[in-house]
C-alpha cells in the first residue's frame, strides 16, 4: 500500500476536543475521544480481521508540530513508525507514531521493530504508560484523497509516557472506517 495520507500538511490546527466537539458526529466523537485502545475497538469491528501494514519503521527527523508537542527542538531526531490499520482489506486508520527515549536506546528501538504487531497492544498492555489529553484535528481538503469522500478526515493525537520514554501517537480516521459503520 502506498501512503496517501500524512501529518505534514501546512496549517494543521490541533486543538483540545472541546473546541471541535460541535463539528463531530456522535459516531466520530465516540471514536475520536475514546481513551481506550483503538486496536481493541478495531478488532471488534473487524471480527478480529484487523491487519497492521507497516509503511515505515526507522529513525528520522520529527515534524515541527511533533517536536513542539514533545517539547523538543526543531530538527530533533526520533523513531518514526507509520502503519495502516486495515479491516476487511481496506485501510481504516493511518497512524504515525514518534518514539523518543532519553533512557534506554534499546527499549525505544524495540518499538521500531514491531512489524505487523499493533503498537496499541504494548501501550495498553500492562498499564505502565500514562496517556495525555487527546487533541483532534479536522482536515479541510488537506489531502486529495479526502476531497473525493463524503466523510471528513479527522485525526487525533496524544502522548504516552513511561519513565523516560515518550510516544506520540497520531491516528487519522479514514473514510473507509466511517463507511464500515454507516
Curated annotation (Swiss-Prot):
Molecular function (Gene Ontology), one example: chorismate lyase activity
EC class (word): lyase
Keyword field contains Disulfide bond: no
Alphabetized UniProt keyword annotations: Cytoplasm, Lyase, Pyruvate, Ubiquinone biosynthesis
Location of the protein in the cell: Cytoplasm
Gene: ubiC
The organism's taxonomic lineage, starting at the top: Bacteria, Pseudomonadati, Pseudomonadota, Gammaproteobacteria, Pseudomonadales
Protein name in UniProt: Probable chorismate pyruvate-lyase
Provenance organism: Pseudomonas putida (Arthrobacter siderocapsulatus)
Function comment: Removes the pyruvyl group from chorismate, with concomitant aromatization of the ring, to provide 4-hydroxybenzoate (4HB) for the ubiquinone pathway.
GO cellular component: cytosol
PANTHER family found in the cross-reference section: CHORISMATE PYRUVATE-LYASE (PTHR38683:SF1)
Catalytic reactions on record: chorismate = 4-hydroxybenzoate + pyruvate
Family per record: Belongs to the UbiC family.
EC number from the UniProt entry: 4.1.3.40
InterPro entries noted in UniProt: Chorismate--pyruvate_lyase, Chorismate_lyase_/UTRA_dom_sf
Functional pathway: Cofactor biosynthesis; ubiquinone biosynthesis
GO terms classed as biological process: pyruvate biosynthetic process; ubiquinone biosynthetic process
Residues binding substrate: 81, 119, 171
Amino acid at each position: 500500500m502506498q501512503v496517501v495520507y500524512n501529518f505534514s500538511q501546512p496549517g494543521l490546527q490541533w486543538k483540545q476536543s472541546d473546541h471541535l466537539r460541535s463539528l463531530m458526529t456522535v459516531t466520530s466523537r465516540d471514536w475520536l475521544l475514546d481513551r481506550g485502545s483503538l486496536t481493541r475497538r478495531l478488532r471488534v469491528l473487524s471480527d478480529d480481521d484487523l491487519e497492521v501494514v507497516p509503511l515505515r519503521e526507522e529513525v528520522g527527523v520529527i515534524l515541527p508540530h511533533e517536536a513542539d508537542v514533545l517539547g523538543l527542538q526543531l530538527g530533533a531526531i526520533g523513531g518514526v513508525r507509520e502503519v495502516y490499520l486495515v479491516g476487511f482489506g481496506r485501510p481504516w486508520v493511518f497512524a504515525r507514531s514518534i518514539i523518543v527515549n532519553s533512557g534506554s536506546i534499546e527499549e525505544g528501538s524495540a518499538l521500531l521493530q514491531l512489524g505487523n504487531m499493533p503498537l496499541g497492544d504494548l501501550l495498553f498492555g500492562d498499564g505502565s504508560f500514562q496517556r495525555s489529553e487527546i487533541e483532534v484535528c479536522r482536515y479541510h481538503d488537506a489531502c486529495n484523497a479526502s476531497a473525493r469522500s463524503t466523510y471528513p478526515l479527522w485525526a487525533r493525537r496524544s502522548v504516552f509516557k513511561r519513565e523516560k520514554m515518550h510516544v506520540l501517537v497520531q491516528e487519522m480516521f479514514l473514510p473507509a472506517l466511517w463507511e464500515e459503520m454507516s
